[in-house]
């Protein structure tokens, strides 16, 4: 193929007909931390350069190196021998023409604008027409099973690098819905005067600009295929240029609930009060879809539910959403601003896996740290039975109260929930001195480093650690090994398919003296 300055990528789909291709539009780089204006002009005018992709970075970008003819054209001989370049949309073994988008002293970044030879057999046609522009996901060009295998390799590498350990057993990856799975998100909104239309969606890659979307294949289809209608709605509002964001939350429809069940909620963040006419338009749109409507003008305390019909009960600030864990006969109630796992199908499998790994027996006592709504606490309580107990500890008082409510609604009487700042040693609290057979940790991305400092005082025989960041899991694993635990199991979960995000789970067992 001849070199090209086109900003399109031809994806060769090895799993389809040999001649089938998919074109992905790649926008100009709009990164906030830009090189100098002179460097930007040089990068913009530069021809794409040929590279062979040697491997992948932890976020799924291809890695190539200047030298031996790579990064050179007939009219351009490079002096960057050995310098790495991270290439979006490229897979190992492929030869690609790469448009440089960012140049730094120690590395460069670029986009594969054409695969010229040796397309990776795991390359597929991205299902979403906006892939390459939208920053919502970055791996749709790669077969999903290959993505999750790669994510396990990322976890394995980090465990070796930071803790010098491998688990006794690798778990089978947990996979669920890979499209239409995301039930929580924040979508940016911007009205473009020149185009006389609103944009609704995620930001463009490496940019603060919103991508121009008509649909989203990652979002639950109840919202993902309503984006065009949301754009049209916002464009008709008097305050169309004052809507900043839509926060969405979705639950499951429960057939046993009355007709008032509204499993989709949107919070409209408006920068100034809306006119009565605008509110009426929103009410008509939301009522037709049986969605919950909220307005938010300032902070979280300003969120206001809007009645769509005369029978709506506004005695509380929020309506209710629900999800279920059928394995344990549990129904969870939550409000739109609560933290919940975004992939309900993976969450069902994840909770079962965590419970199985703890290998609980009737009568045992379990401590659940960062317990949230009780997503793990309530299944654990089912397993230990009435003679056992579960203590859930969570930083948010509101979430702690919601967990206790969920326990009562599900007829569970062997749980206790406490609100506590877990970054400080809390082992002097009465709840912490009950003695625990097993412990579950599900911390934020920052991990549980502070907890690692006082965790030995709980003296739990078994620990399951659920992580949304393999780097902090690996760091905390090292601490647990030093405290006399063995890493028996580890694995990854496909919570965020088509992104570089790695969700993982690990089991530790106390080594007998």
UniProtKB/Swiss-Prot annotation:
The lineage of its organism: Bacteria, Pseudomonadati, Pseudomonadota, Gammaproteobacteria, Moraxellales. This is 23S rRNA (uracil(1939)-C(5))-methyltransferase RlmD. NCBIfam families: PRK13168.1 (NF009639), rumA (TIGR00479). Residues 29-43 have a biased composition (Basic residues). Gene3D superfamilies: 2.40.50.1070, Nucleic acid-binding proteins, Vaccinia Virus protein VP39. Keywords: 4Fe-4S, Iron, Iron-sulfur, Metal-binding, Methyltransferase, rRNA processing, S-adenosyl-L-methionine, Transferase. Residues 1-22 have a biased composition (Polar residues). GO terms for molecular function: 4 iron, 4 sulfur cluster binding; iron ion binding; RNA binding; rRNA (uridine-C5-)-methyltransferase activity. PROSITE patterns: SAM_MT_RNA_M5U, TRAM, TRMA_1. It comes from Psychrobacter cryohalolentis (strain ATCC BAA-1226 / DSM 17306 / VKM B-2378 / K5). Belongs to the class I-like SAM-binding methyltransferase superfamily. RNA M5U methyltransferase family. RlmD subfamily. Residues 42-114 form the TRAM domain.
